[in-house]
Amino acid sequence: SSIVFFSLEINEISEKSLKKIYADKKLNIYKNWIKNIRKFKPYQLDVKTEKLLQEKSITSRSAWVRLFDDTIASLKFPFKGKNLSSAEIFNFLSDKKESNRKKSAEVVSAVLKDNISLFTSITNNLAQVNSIKDKWRGLPNPVGSRNLSHVVEDEVVDALTETINVNSP
């Protein structure tokens, strides 16, 4: 949770002080990183609430992410007479041979489909956790924090989503 306070403190630095920091060649390399952190400033909560959210993430968001990671790591993918790990089968998705790419994609799809209930539950819970957190922060939409993290405007994501929806079968 101490990393939370690092971001909070960066957001407390005055613009005047930041100009001095950016003027220093050794510190200027952090300019974009600092600017990205400061984009969250309007949505920052008080210190106690930020600490609560951070500590709560251990049993909410982090737990779901860990369950996903552990599940993916434990899956076995039958491919060419062997049971491969996720890392091994995913390598075949970019294999030189088209037949290997196609077969590995089919295997991955089949194994993931067998676990669709669990992955759906994980995805829905993660979406709900983010939605609640973003609502508390006053972000304009449920994916606002993701867009800020990825340094992309909501309108760009909306336009991309619309284009995909219009052009998908």
Regions from the PLM with identified roles:
Residues 1-169:
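A well-structured
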